[in-house]
Amino acid sequence: MSGFNDRYSHLLSKARQAMRFGRCAWAVQSTGEQVAVALVLNRADWLDELGYTLAEAIERAGQEWVAMIPQVARQLAESR
């Protein structure tokens, strides 16, 4: 379970950075992180910039990350 917690914390941290500092914080992340963070933040424009459709982004992020996205998004919304 700690592996899940580590990955959850990592995604939350990357999404929080992008939420606070915008595109410049997002642009330096790995492609996988960029895709997952764009999904968390509901940024279809960022996905488009990467050349991903929504369906392709979900596939790229993978089942484990996609499962975390709603919870990470809720936690970010609650912390605003």
For each predicted feature, which ranges?
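Charged, low-complexity intrinsically disordered segments and flexible loops
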Residues: 1-37, 41-80
